Amino acid sequence: MITIKKMAELLGTSTTTVSNVIHGKEGEVSPVMVEKVKKLIEEYDYVPNRNARNLASNRSGIIGLAMKASENKYDNFVKDPFAGELIGAVERYVRAKGYFTMLYVSSDIGEIISSVSSWNVDGLILLGMQKEDGELLNQKMKKPMVFVDAYFEDVSFDYVNVGIDDRKGGREITEYLIQSGHQKIAFLADNCMGVDYQRFMGYRDALTSAGLPWNEENFIRLRPSGADMSLILSQAYDRARDFTAFICASDYYAAFILNDLKDRGMKIPEELSIVGFDDNVCSRLVRPALTTVHQDVTEKSRITVEKLFHIINDEDYGANFEQLPVFIVERSSVRKM
């Protein structure tokens, strides 16, 4: 492969001039010479040495994407289409910036910090973090960071987060069920923190506004056990006759529960209406198709990457908190009573 030195010799110019064109510093080179260098690059199919460029700029060219997932939630967190869609979109937008994405998933924040620190990343995107995780990251990591879907209350540090209006989504899907004639509505989630807590609070807001009673038994805490979904499905089945509608905190759980209840002989939505949250592929694959809350994961990923690179480049990144809108997608899983 041709070198910068050889190109400079062929063009009768300096290696600095050729290097400036290759690295986009064309303002320091005459237009005629810029065209000559570009023509030579194309002729010899020259590919810049990324390692040398990163060394010169004191950057690694790596963006870390770290996800914290409960060890008993999934045997593989990426199986959830929400996670897969976000990872794919982040990687695509990071790659468009000329960077690489390194992914790390763990239930241990200490392990995440230790591993990510060894990568010498230029910036970090963080998902699934709770308040104490954010505080530890702020103490230990001195890299540009953008959180996704974080809700840190009463913290002493500034942080940047991109999310959606989870509480509004929980409220609107509950109002939709109430307007459809439902009053006995359960909320199902595997935790009551972060985004699931916000969605749950939206559910409670809607019940309160409608004058409907609520008690703790209406919150069905799903208890996953890795790859084994049988416990969750049994939990849902045992409570299904107590309600006319289930609100699941994610399409992932809603799809599993819907299919299992049908397999056990329940008619959906005639005997039980089921709705989800996310509007991912799960909502469209099951029958009846899920009514759900839509969020634009691709746009969330794009904004996250843009903010991170603005921070890396010491540019204005806008507001610390970016909240994307949500809306109801009506399909076939809700009975009008």
Predicted regions and their residues:
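Flexible loop/turn connectors
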Residues: 230-337
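Flexible loop/hinge segments that line or gate small-molecule binding clefts
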Residues: 127-169, 252, 278-290
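Hydrophobic alpha-helical segments within soluble ligand-binding/sensing domains
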Residues: 160-187, 197, 226-234, 293-313
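Short acidic capping loops at alpha-helix termini that bridge into adjacent secondary structure
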Residues: 184, 214-218, 268-274
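Amphipathic helical "hinge" segments at domain boundaries
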Residues: 46-113
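An alpha-beta-alpha
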Residues: 171-212, 320-333
